[in-house]
């Protein structure tokens, strides 16, 4: 069974388009937000399986707030710089995973339910 929706917010429109296309094979609805407020509205409306959030578009406090606001929804963060300290803080704030923005496959793997990950890896 295909998860229904995913919502993403990216600072780079090219990354947003690439992720949206990649995720459309695994999710019925891929909703690209242009702001944190728009992301919140889309998440409240569509109750996504996961939120993919660029750390250049949000603060650690935003990650923590989203995790509490949308309990049960996976929060996958990404950033263009591979910074272990920042990622550790992000995971501590409540993110389920953190990946480099350039690692589309890693972001997709983190967002897709484990039961479907064998199809993603193929």
Which ranges hold each PLM region?
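Alpha4 helix (beta4-alpha4-beta5 surface) of REC/receiver domains from two-component response regulators
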Residues: 79-98
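Conserved phosphotransfer cores of two-component systems
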Residues: 44-46, 66-72, 93
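Conserved acidic carboxylate
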Residues: 10
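Receiver (REC) domain switch/output surface
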Residues: 107-122
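Two-component signal transduction core modules
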Residues: 51, 98-99
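Two-component/phosphorelay signaling modules centered on CheY-like receiver
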Residues: 13-31
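Conserved phosphotransfer microenvironments
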Residues: 49-69, 83-86
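Acidic, metal-coordinating helix/loop segments flanking the phosphotransfer/catalytic sites
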Residues: 34-50, 58
